[in-house]
């Protein structure tokens, strides 16, 4: 583990020496957390949250966003669960219960055909409602109702709307009447594995796992209205083009409302769950990825699917997003490894702590020009 962390530190230092300097700021200015989806691998977020809590970062967070397993963590953090409480929750969950079939092949097959998933997903939905109820006394609370109480963090959950082909953000501002438990259920609806969710938000659309289209929503808070301090905005060439188009459209429509510009929000801190090789390859432009031996239809199909998934995960990212991302080694554990042992759970927690510590060490090093 220590060699892996040292390798990440080395790559961070090398990358940052070639990047532009940024204006210095207080030790931490993070206000938003974003959690990537990763199924069972999300246990690693426990270690990351413990480290954020120790550093005093967690208490300053105002907004949280997440996809799939990251959505579950985002809800818990948003409701005010402590790092220890979240650790206890994720440690005690029997992930095999997520596979809530009907104990009958015919019923499962019927659901697969009609609802597009083998498992019901009811166990997860009920579980989330129970955690929500413990903090709010209402397991069926909507985003608006939660926001109106003004004592919780703002929660943003990612889903995929198959009816439109676009990502769907669930939040108090965008979907005020949607129940948080329902949005969490949508966000973790692995296609074909869990039944899709239909008829949400007053329509007949079909929703599935947010990870299908945006598994790592690091840019969800990249708008001017999400900034607490304008000093933490960075103007980028890629957003400049988008903003110019928005302004031109506003002029043509003679809109009197001010354009809510896109900005690179340095107040956002994200967490990703990747294999060691993936992390190194993304951080180090000179790294050479390993090659896959393709000699059969099976290996060809596997390589094709893997390539498409990797493309989807990274296509929306830019070269400067690594500066606000904590990459956590998922240790080769799969998203649906529901039989995960306590030993592997502990290893994930330690990986979360170690890689978060590595990032913060880099971030706080005065000799380096971090995302400040």
Task: Tell where the protein language model's regions lie, with residue ranges.
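Patatin-like phospholipase
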Residues: 1-65, 75-372
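Gly/Ala-rich beta-loop-alpha elbow adjacent to hydrolase catalytic centers
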Residues: 66, 70
């Amino acid at each position: 583990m220590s060699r892996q962390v040292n390798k990440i530190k080395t790559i961070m230092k090398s990358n940052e020496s070639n990047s532009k300097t940024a204006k210095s700021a207080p030790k931490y200015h993070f206000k938003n957390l974003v959690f990537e989806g990763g199924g069972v691998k999300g246990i690693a977020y426990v270690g990351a949250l413990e480290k954020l809590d120790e550093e005093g970062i967690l208490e300053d967070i105002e907004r949280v966003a997440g996809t799939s397993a990251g959505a579950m963590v985002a809800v818990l953090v948003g409701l005010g669960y402590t790092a220890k409480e979240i650790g206890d929750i994720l440690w005690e969950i029997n992930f095999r219960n997520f596979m809530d079939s009907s104990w009958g092949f015919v019923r499962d097959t019927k659901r697969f055909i009609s609802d597009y998933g083998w498992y019901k997903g009811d166990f997860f939905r009920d579980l989330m409602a129970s955690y929500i109820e413990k903090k709010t006394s209402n397991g069926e609370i909507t985003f608006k109702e939660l926001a109106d109480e003004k004592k919780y963090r703002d929660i943003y959950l990612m889903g995929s709307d198959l009816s439109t082909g676009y990502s769907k953000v669930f939040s108090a501002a965008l979907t005020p009447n949607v129940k948080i438990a329902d949005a969490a259920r949508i966000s973790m609806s692995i296609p074909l594995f869990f039944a899709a969710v239909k008829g949400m938000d007053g329509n007949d659309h079909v929703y599935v796992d947010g990870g299908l289209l945006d598994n790592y929503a690091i840019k969800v808070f990249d708008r001017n209205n999400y900034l607490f301090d304008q000093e933490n905005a960075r103007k980028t060439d890629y957003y400049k083009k988008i903003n110019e188009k928005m302004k031109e459209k506003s002029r043509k429509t003679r809109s009197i409302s001010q354009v809510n510009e896109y900005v690179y929000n340095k107040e956002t801190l994200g967490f990703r769950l990747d294999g060691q090789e993936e992390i190194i390859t993304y951080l180090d432009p000179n790294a050479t990825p390993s090659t896959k031996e393709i000699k059969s239809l099976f290996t060809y199909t596997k390589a094709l699917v893997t390539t498409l998934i990797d493309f989807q995960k990274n296509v929306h990212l830019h070269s400067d997003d690594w500066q606000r991302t904590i990459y956590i080694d998922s240790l080769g554990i799969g998203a649906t490894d529901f039989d995960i042992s306590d030993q592997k759970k502990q290893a994930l927690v330690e990986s979360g702590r170690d890689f978060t510590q590595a990032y913060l060490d880099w971030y706080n090093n005065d000799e380096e020009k971090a995302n400040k």
